[in-house]
Amino acid sequence: MTASASRTVAALFALALAATPAVAQVGKPVTVKDANTIAEAEIAALPYMNVEIAKALVAARPFPNATAFDAFLEGKLSKEQRAELYAKLWVHIDLNSASREEIALIPGMGPRMIREFLEYRPYASMAVFRREIGKYVNAKEVGRLERFLRFP
């Protein structure tokens, strides 16, 4: 391939990449499925889930919050199993109105981070959340936490 052809291919690739819309948006995670919208078959394929639980979950929807979702799963999965599942299936919590109990359900949350989440509310934007929580954890962890949130 000539240098001119290489530049043309590179330019076309860059143009195509720039024209491709972003798939993930704030509060719309790529890897954490929404328990209120995920298909029954997808639920059944998740860790610790089966067809029976998937059918019951779909019948119980919509879950108004993460606490209600956790209560639904409580008799079906152990606390450890639920924590592992929540990394893949979740009811996104409202950043400004979630209860302490809801925030505590986010995998990996401890008392300090719960306190920090609550201290800076209300958040005017997701950028404010990133800035404030970024004082306590690195950008990768802020991004991980964002997967469980929605901004009103």
Label for each model-derived stretch:
Residues 69-73, 128-133:
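Short, tandemly repeated low-complexity microdomains enriched for cysteine and small residues
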Residues 111, 115-121, 127, 141-152:
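A basic, often C-terminal nucleic-acid-binding module that engages the phosphate backbone, implemented
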Residues 132-140:
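Short, exposed beta-strand-loop hairpins at the edges of beta-sheets
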Residues 10-20:
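Bacterial N-terminal signal peptides
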Residues 65-66, 124-126:
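Short, charged, surface-exposed loops that flank catalytic or proteolytic processing sites
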Residues 18-105, 114, 144, 150-152:
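Long, highly charged, low-complexity intrinsically disordered interaction regions
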Residues 1-12:
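Bacterial N-terminal signal peptides that target proteins for export
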